[in-house]
């Protein structure tokens, strides 16, 4: 997911990895991620990682300006990684970092030894790889429940000791290496364990947490079916705080992947060690069990108040497998039947009717961070307070001075520390994004949420306003000196009592109430996401006018709908001519050619096997003229002209009435009787009499006579009863007229001769060849009940 411009080389593996100078602009990286993921800025494109080519230089750096990372930081606590070696727990040290526009979290964790730095299976490296791989699910909008990484840097402990805020918590030995991991913190962030301690747990809260856990495990399993988290406990799960009226709901964020693995893709050596004894069973449900079983054992006082929540636990945590164990064991799992195990598959749980959808958080807004600029100072001793003065200035409820230094000799396991909102600061601002938000006064009402105590701080909030204004003015003056900063419009300004904060995920982006500035259109590329090539030039994008507030909200509301490109409304010109006139002239020419030379090319008739010419007057039987000559020669050599043979063609109805036909044919004028006799003589083959007549008449199979000058009355009638372009007969065509015409034609041919004087074989051959020389009548939209059509497959219209 990183962009590629400049090259850096890993000497150990001799692998060339392309990196981007943008990686060294930390604040720009953090801003890019926010705009791409939370604002849904379409100026970025995703560049996915090739999982077949996983190597460490793709996931971390070994050379970085630490002054940029530790510019303005604040100690946040020590948190477990889950790694325990010889009884010693390895913890992360957290610092909250205030950037130019957004917040972030710095996590510092020691490697076990120097060799582990380049070991791709080491759990610390596995954590960095996992966060980067799974972040693709977030940027591709599969899930919001994974905390996004920004950069990972390996540093020596001796380099970290030069920063006064950091040195008390690390080992200064030159042979101790640390992983410095910068992750997102756009809103108020804390562990799920701390959330349970600080807030009242409602039914909707419990249901939402369980659903989010199921959904994120499902989304990961779709991409990586062999994924295992192995420690889905509240103290290893981060969460953003979201608010719906007075209810605070956590949006869980998986970020602790030290014990994770993906079989055959990301191997974790720690899982094969003697220090890890967890059974790998039940696929993703084994991870879910850790969370729901913990909640059942530790939130009983809240769960028992809600019967509907108890029903949810009966489904996701059957009574047979409830226990005081942290992990699901094979003994517990085997207590279930195969049907019960099937119902506990992550996919089946996710689709269960007990959950509505992930949209349970759709009407909530993010809670902004309560950290104030005065709480942050540079990490180096030259421009910061002393460690003692800094700790004295911290809120006593926010920092536990008994937290041990995170060293390899530490024996502390799974401490619980708050890294988000300070314990005595529970006030949550309930601001709404409106067009006149900038006109609101600084004394807006706020809704209070408490777990065991309430807090009012109107005076301190007013004092924070002046701090916020001062900080914002400094930020704006700094932004004006850099081309990548954002020009602010009057619509984009927010109330003066809000601190610089950051965006949201999913539908919560619509509110975006914490943003004080809209994002700039950066012309650089991000490590995680790249700019689209379709963007306008860098100069115009940098100097573009400020983003209009209403337009931005409009785009956010319709973000789930694909954008429609503007239609081209001009006239296309070829040379000096308008394209429309050229096409019109070309079409006229084609039409005239088609009138003079009818063709079946590119026509429906050609697809059906019948051309317009064949349907009108021509016959496709190559032996047709020879057969007709043979029939004509049997008429005592009589080769009369059209008038002598047929009389006046226009008066044929007056010359041949039914009585005359009966006299000529020697029997009463009965079509069925006549054709039964002909059929007995073998003159009509196997054709049905009535349908054969209709086919011959409509398809024009009685072509011209042997000589050129002879007129074909059937051809004339076929021109009178034309076929439509789809090959279907005219609806006004009368089958009785077909019968009359054929009898008149046969009578005229005989001119009083008996039928026995004609060669029956010639007529039978003519009728049989013509019946097979044309496609089925059903294909032309006719009746499929014809006996000859019963064995044919009807075409697309019948």
From Swiss-Prot:
Q: Which UniProt keywords apply?
A: Virion
Q: Which residue ranges have biased composition labelled Polar residues?
A: 519-529
Q: Where is the composition biased (Basic residues)?
A: 563-572
Q: Could you tell me where the Low complexity compositional bias lies? A: 438-449, 456-465, 473-487, 495-510, 535-547
Judging by the UniProt lineage, the source's domain of life is Viruses
Name the residue ranges with Basic and acidic residues bias: 548-562
- In which compartments does the protein localize? Virion
Q: Where is this region: Disordered?
A: 432-573
Main location (coarse class): virion
UniProt-recorded name of the protein: Uncharacterized protein R402
């Amino acid at each position: 997911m990183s962009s590629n411009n400049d090259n850096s080389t890993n000497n150990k593996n001799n692998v060339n990895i392309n990196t981007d100078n943008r990686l060294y602009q930390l604040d720009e990286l953090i801003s890019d991620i926010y705009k791409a993921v939370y604002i849904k800025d379409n100026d970025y494109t995703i560049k996915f990682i090739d999982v077949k080519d996983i190597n460490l230089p793709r996931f971390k750096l070994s050379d970085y300006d630490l002054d940029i990372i530790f510019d303005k930081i604040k100690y946040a606590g020590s948190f477990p990684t889950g790694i325990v070696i010889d009884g010693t727990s390895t913890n992360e040290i957290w610092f909250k970092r205030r950037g130019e526009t957004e917040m972030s979290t710095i996590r510092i964790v020691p490697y076990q030894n120097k060799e582990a730095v380049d070991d791709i299976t080491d759990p610390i490296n596995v954590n960095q790889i996992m966060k980067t791989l799974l972040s693709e699910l977030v940027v591709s909008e599969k899930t919001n429940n994974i905390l996004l990484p920004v950069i990972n840097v390996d540093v020596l402990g001796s380099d970290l000791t030069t920063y006064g805020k950091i040195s008390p918590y690390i080992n200064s030995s030159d042979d101790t290496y640390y992983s410095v991991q910068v992750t997102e913190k756009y809103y108020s962030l804390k562990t799920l364990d701390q959330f349970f301690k600080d807030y009242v747990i409602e039914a909707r809260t419990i249901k939402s947490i369980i659903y989010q856990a199921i959904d994120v495990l499902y989304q990961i399993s779709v991409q990586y079916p062999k994924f295992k988290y192995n420690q889905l406990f509240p103290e290893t799960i981060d969460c953003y705080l979201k608010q719906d009226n007075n209810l605070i709901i956590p949006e869980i964020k998986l970020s602790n992947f030290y014990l994770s693995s993906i079989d055959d893709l990301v191997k974790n050596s720690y899982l094969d060690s003697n220090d890890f004894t967890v059974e790998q069973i039940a696929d993703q449900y084994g991870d879910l069990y850790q969370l729901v079983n913990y909640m059942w054992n530790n939130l009983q006082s809240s769960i028992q108040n809600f019967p509907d929540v108890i029903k949810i636990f009966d489904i996701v945590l059957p009574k047979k497998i409830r226990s005081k164990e942290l992990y699901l064991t094979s003994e517990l799992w085997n207590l279930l039947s195969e049907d019960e195990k099937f119902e506990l598959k992550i996919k089946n749980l996710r689709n269960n009717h007990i959950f509505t959808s992930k949209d349970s958080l759709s009407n909530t807004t993010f809670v902004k961070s309560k950290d104030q600029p005065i709480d942050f100072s540079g990490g180096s001793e030259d421009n910061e307070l002393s460690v003692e003065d800094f700790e004295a200035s911290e809120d006593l409820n926010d920092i536990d001075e008994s937290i041990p230094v995170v060293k390899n000799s530490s024996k502390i396991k799974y401490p619980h520390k708050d890294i988000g909102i300070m314990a005595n600061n529970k006030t949550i601002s309930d601001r709404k994004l409106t067009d006149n938000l900038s006109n609101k006064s600084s004394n807006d009402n706020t809704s209070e949420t408490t777990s065991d105590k309430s807090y009012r701080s109107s005076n301190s909030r007013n004092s924070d306003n002046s701090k916020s204004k001062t900080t914002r003015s400094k930020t704006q003056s700094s932004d004006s000196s850099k081309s990548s900063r954002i020009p602010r419009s009057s619509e984009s300004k927010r109330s003066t009592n809000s601190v610089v904060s950051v965006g949201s995920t999913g539908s919560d982006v619509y509110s975006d109430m914490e943003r004080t500035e809209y994002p700039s259109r950066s012309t650089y590329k991000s490590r995680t996401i790249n700019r689209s090539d379709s963007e306008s030039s860098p100069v115009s994008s940098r100097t573009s006018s400020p983003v209009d507030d209403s337009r931005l909200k409009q785009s956010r509301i319709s973000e789930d709908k694909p954008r429609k490109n503007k239609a081209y409304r001009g006239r296309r010109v070829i040379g000096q001519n308008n394209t429309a006139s050229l096409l019109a002239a070309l079409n006229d020419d084609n039409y005239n050619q088609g009138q003079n030379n009818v063709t079946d090319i590119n026509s429906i008739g050609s697809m059906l096997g019948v051309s317009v010419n064949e349907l009108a007057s021509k016959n496709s039987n190559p032996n047709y003229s020879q057969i007709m000559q043979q029939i004509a020669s049997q008429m005592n050599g009589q080769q009369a002209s059209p008038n002598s043979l047929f009389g006046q063609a226009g008066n044929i109805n007056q010359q041949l009435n039914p009585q005359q036909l009966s006299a000529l044919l020697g029997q009463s004028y009965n079509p069925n009787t006549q054709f039964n006799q002909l059929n007995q003589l073998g003159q009509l083959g196997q054709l049905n009499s009535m349908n054969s007549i209709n086919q011959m008449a409509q398809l024009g199979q009685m072509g011209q006579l042997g000589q050129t000058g002879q007129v074909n009355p059937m051809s004339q009638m076929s021109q009178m009863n034309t076929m439509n372009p789809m090959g279907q007969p005219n609806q006004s065509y009368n089958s009785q007229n077909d019968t009359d015409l054929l009898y008149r034609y046969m009578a005229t041919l005989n001119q009083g001769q008996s039928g026995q004087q004609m060669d029956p074989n010639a007529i039978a051959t003519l009728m049989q060849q013509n019946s097979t020389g044309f496609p089925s009548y059903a294909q032309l939209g006719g009746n499929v009940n014809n006996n000859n059509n019963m064995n044919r497959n009807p075409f697309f219209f019948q």
